[in-house]
Amino acid sequence: MSEQRKKKGESVGQTIGGMLVGFDQQIFRSTPPVNEMVAKGDRLAPVAASGGGTMRVGLPGDPAAPDAAPGAIDPEIEVLRLSAPGVEALVDLVAGGRIASLVVDGRELLRTSRDGPRDWGSFPMAPYAGRIRDAEFTFGGEVRRLAATMPPHAIHGTVLDRRWHAIDGTTIAIDLGPDWPFVGGVVQSFELTSDSMTCRMELHADEPMPASIGWHPWFLRRIAGTAGELELDVEPGAMYARDAAGIATEELVPPAPEPWDDCFTDLRRPPVLRWPGFLEMTIESDCPDWVIYTSPSDALCVEPQTAPPDALNTDPTVVQPGRPLSAVMTWRWRSLAP
């Protein structure tokens, strides 16, 4: 088993749902205040791309939010709304702590249609990213079973469809839930500027556990009023070979041509998304592995993660108490308008 890929400095924290949440001072720096924190039942004013009316964020049919854990600023907060000149973002706490919307210069960049919790916005993956073969893994000499969320496999972790809680205006937290056989939790922090959005994640363990984390954004291929379809510029050094079940193995092979639903590593430079005549976005991350999914006709996914799919069964990172697993992702954009 591999050691954690990086170590962090001393953390300070507070107890969230029985878990000590460490706010690593090297990671969670102060960020600009959000414009709004929207409570349950309040009406949310439209973001710039919505064209008027009101907008309700949260999956239909979600249960009422449970009582907040100690340290949460308000158990009724459902949405964080961040803004900067020319940019607005919504973070939906009810729908898995995801970025539900990112509007730049009046245009939405993310898929917002909601066929299911794995199909929209940009959601966090924890305590595992990607598929886990047959929804099981062995740790400490014991076979651990997971919920088969993509039968017969498990996929994308236990926090993407559960309710998060606001810790402050830019920070949210959740425990790992009943479908994970270890005790721990996740903290996310967000920072928005006029030309970038940064997401930081920490997974905290109350006991040694294998884990990986990452993000799964859905970027729209076509944006109304722009000149053409989204282009992806990426140069991976290697690709994890997939087996007959479609799950990444430990074997590294030369990258195959598109379409992709594959995990890559050793990228020569950060991936770049380009909407011709509108916007260019560079995706930066300290994650070593990237899943890229190009098959959908209306969107594509570029997913930084700390380990490849099925890492719990191959070469798991073991997270220790007091030594959180952390990752950072930044979307940085510039205008291509003439």
Where are these regions (language model features)?
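Active-site/ligand-binding surface loops and adjacent short beta/alpha elements
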Residues: 56-68, 208-210, 217-286
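Extreme N-terminal basic, low-complexity initiation segments
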Residues: 1-15, 21, 32
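Active-site pocket scaffolds in enzymes
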Residues: 279-338
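Acidic, contiguous internal or C-terminal segments within carbohydrate-active enzymes
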Residues: 174-224
